[in-house]
Amino acid sequence: MSHAPGSNEHSNDAYYAHYQSLQLHRHPHGVLEVVMSGEGANRSALATANARMHFELAEIWRDIDRDPDTRVAIIRGEGKGFSAGGDLQLVEDMATDFDVRARVWREARDLVYNVINCSKPIVSAMHGPAVGAGLVAGLLADISIATKTARIIDGHTRLGVAAGDHAAIVWPLLCGMAKAKYYLMLCEPVSGEEAERIGLVSLAVDEPELLPKAFEVAQKLANGSQTAIRWTKYALNNWLRSAGPAFDTSLALEFMGFAGPDVREGVNSLRERRAPDFGASDPWRGQPQPPSDDRAAGDERS
């Protein structure tokens, strides 16, 4: 994915100087570009949500909301795709360390609510794989644009945990409960073209058109009435806020799963590049069973 035309250097102003994993670029008319990229010199690699990236993805929307010079934000990935899944070392730390698990739960909650409550409109530009924490911002964005060949994947059940994060709060609203259950429970990939067809994203375009379209939309939003646009976003996002209890439940169940046996098998299978085997785990094993026919008959005679 080529760099956006006309972009400025990384923003080092007071709002964004502390960001390390996210690259920030200011554009004319109040457009801020947020770029997720690989670590170190390998910027073209998929952006993996390690501990630092996860923290920054949750925090950036508060700073954008406070930034008087930003009217609209674009979030995109660098290199081969939009975003990779969570860093496996972070997943293992969550599985073994309660403090880490509690911290990441709080960040996961904040990421969803901070995107929803950010008063500035957000445009996402997704290409290649779109997975993990980056996908949260990608699908919760006010205008979501994907290439037709993008691969949107909610990988929670493949890892061995419930589909938390943004899944329960936005998938049923965007594409309906039947499609949401199909893709979330089976961990099936969705192409950008199919995502547009079912209503999961706003637009699907050919890859060369992705950034030009994202900036075209952003410029229109930046040039429009800011009170009208922001108040429209606020009102529409009450649909998402009303799903808050479902989201909180899904996130709690997801993070309860990080303390269970399935996530260890999920991590091992990803490291070994094989299908997971969850056959040995059954959370309902050992539950009280109904009485036998003989016992039931005896109860009726007494």
How should these model regions be labeled?
Residues 36-40, 95, 126, 199:
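Short, histidine-centered active-site or binding-site loop motifs used for metal coordination
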Residues 113-229, 260, 264-268, 274:
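Crotonase-fold acyl-CoA enzyme core
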Residues 41, 45-52, 69, 77-113, ...:
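Glycine- (often His-adjacent) and acidic-residue-rich active-site loop
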Residues 1-78, 113, 291-302:
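Conserved CoA-thioester-binding segment of acyl-CoA-metabolizing enzymes
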Residues 145-150, 201-249, 255, 259-261, ...:
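C-terminal long alpha-helix characteristic of the crotonase
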